[in-house]
C-alpha cells in the first residue's frame, strides 16, 4: 500500500488555522490539521473564552468561546483530518519537494504546509510582588474563564491595554465594584473602548503602581499602591485581582525545525500569497510579517484563503478553482 501524502498540512489550530482548514475542505484538498493543545482555538479559546472579540466582521461582541464554536461549526461543513494534542517537532523538505512532518506520536507527509502557530507558546507576565504566587488561582488570576466567578465581588484589574479595558467592561455588570489600576493616566486601548471605559462605573486608579499585597484573611486582599512621580499612596481592599500585563510568547520549537525561513523580529516573512522563503511553506496569523501587517484575528481570516488558494493553484494548476463559497454549492 502506497504511503499517504496529504496535499496540505496546517500546523496550528487557532482561528486562522481553523479558517484555513475550512477553505482546504471547500477546495476538496486532502488536508490535515495538527494542534498541540487538546482542543482547537489557540490563545483565544484557551485564555479568553469570556472576553468579547470585536474585530470579526459581522459578529459584534462575540466571546472567544462562541467564536471558536462557530469556527468549529463552519469546519464541519467541509471537514479535514484533525490531530489534537500533538506537537510538531520537525518539518523536513525532501529532494522531491514534499514535506515530512514529525511529531512525538507519528510521521506524516505533505505536498504543502501552512504554519498557523500565532505567537507560539504563551505565558502571562506575572505580578512581581511577594505573596502573589501563593494566591494565584485563588484571589489572583491572569485571565477570566468564567464571569460568574466575579459576581458581587470587588475586583482590581491591573493593566492599561486593550485586554485590561475589555476585562473591566466585561466584569462591570456582574461585579460589585471594578477598579482599573494603571501606572499611566493614558490607556493604550482603542479609542472607542477607552471612551466606553470613561463613561462606565469602573473606578480608574491612575497613575498608580502596585507595590505590595497583603492577604487579610482567606477571602480578601489589600493592595498597596504608589502614585507615580509622587509620594502619595493608596490602598485597595478587594476580593479578586486580575493581572493583565500582557504575555510573553515564543516560537522556539519552530526554530528547531529543518526549515530555513526568513524572519524579522521573530516573525515569519511572507509574500503577498502568504508564501515563506521556502517554496511550498505558507504562514498566516499573528506569527507572520509583511508590509502593512496588523495583528488582528480579522487579518488572519483574510490570509487563510489567500494561502489556501495560492497553494491549491500550484498543486492543481489545471483545476478550475471557484473563488467564492457561494459558487461551491455548499449545503449544511
From Swiss-Prot:
Binds 1 FAD per subunit. Its EC number is 1.18.1.2. It comes from the Bacteria. Keywords: FAD, Flavoprotein, NADP, Oxidoreductase. One of its GO terms (molecular function) is ferredoxin-NADP+ reductase activity. The keyword NADP applies. It catalyses: 2 reduced [2Fe-2S]-[ferredoxin] + NADP(+) + H(+) = 2 oxidized [2Fe-2S]-[ferredoxin] + NADPH. Signal peptide: none annotated. Pfam families: Pyr_redox_2. FAD binds at residues 35, 43, 48, 88, 122, 286, 326. It is an enzyme of class 1 (oxidoreductase). Its cofactor is FAD. Homodimer. Belongs to the ferredoxin--NADP reductase type 2 family. This is Ferredoxin--NADP reductase. It comes from Limosilactobacillus reuteri (strain DSM 20016) (Lactobacillus reuteri). The lineage of its organism: Bacteria, Bacillati, Bacillota, Bacilli, Lactobacillales.
Amino acid at each position: 500500500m502506497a504511503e499517504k501524502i496529504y496535499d496540505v498540512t496546517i500546523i496550528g489550530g487557532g482561528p486562522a488555522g481553523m479558517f484555513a482548514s475550512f477553505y482546504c475542505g471547500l477546495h476538496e484538498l486532502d488536508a490535515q490539521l495538527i494542534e498541540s493543545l487538546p482542543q482547537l482555538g489557540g490563545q483565544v479559546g484557551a485564555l479568553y473564552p469570556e472576553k468579547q472579540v470585536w474585530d470579526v466582521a459581522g459578529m459584534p461582541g462575540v466571546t472567544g468561546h462562541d467564536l471558536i464554536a462557530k469556527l468549529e461549526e463552519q469546519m464541519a461543513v467541509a471537514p479535514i483530518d484533525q490531530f489534537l494534542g500533538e506537537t510538531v517537532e520537525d518539518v523536513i523538505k525532501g529532494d522531491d519537494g514534499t514535506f515530512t512532518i514529525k511529531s512525538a506520536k507519528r510521521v506524516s507527509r505533505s505536498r504543502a504546509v501552512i504554519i498557523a502557530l500565532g505567537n507560539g507558546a504563551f505565558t502571562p507576565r506575572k505580578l512581581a510582588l511577594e505573596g502573589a504566587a501563593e494566591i494565584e488561582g485563588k484571589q489572583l488570576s491572569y485571565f477570566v474563564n468564567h464571569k460568574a466567578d466575579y459576581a458581587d465581588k470587588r475586583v482590581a484589574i491591573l493593566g492599561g491595554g486593550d485586554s485590561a479595558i475589555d476585562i473591566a467592561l466585561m466584569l462591570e455588570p456582574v461585579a460589585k465594584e471594578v477598579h482599573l489600576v494603571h501606572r499611566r493616566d493614558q490607556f493604550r486601548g482603542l479609542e472607542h473602548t477607552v471612551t466606553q471605559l470613561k463613561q462606565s462605573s469602573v473606578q480608574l486608579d491612575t497613575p498608580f503602581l502596585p507595590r505590595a499585597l497583603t492577604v487579610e484573611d482567606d477571602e480578601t486582599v489589600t493592595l498597596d499602591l504608589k502614585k507615580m512621580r509622587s509620594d502619595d499612596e493608596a490602598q485597595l481592599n478587594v476580593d479578586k485581582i486580575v493581572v493583565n500585563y500582557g504575555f510573553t510568547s515564543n516560537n522556539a520549537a519552530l526554530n528547531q525545525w529543518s526549515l530555513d525561513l526568513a524572519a524579522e523580529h521573530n516573525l515569519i516573512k511572507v509574500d503577498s500569497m502568504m508564501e515563506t522563503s521556502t517554496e511550498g511553506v505558507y504562514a498566516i496569523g499573528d506569527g507572520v510579517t509583511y508590509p502593512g501587517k496588523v495583528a488582528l484575528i480579522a487579518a488572519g481570516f483574510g490570509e487563510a484563503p489567500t494561502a489556501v488558494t495560492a497553494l491549491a493553484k500550484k498543486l492543481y494548476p489545471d483545476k478550475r478553482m471557484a473563488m467564492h463559497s457561494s459558487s461551491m454549492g455548499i449545503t449544511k
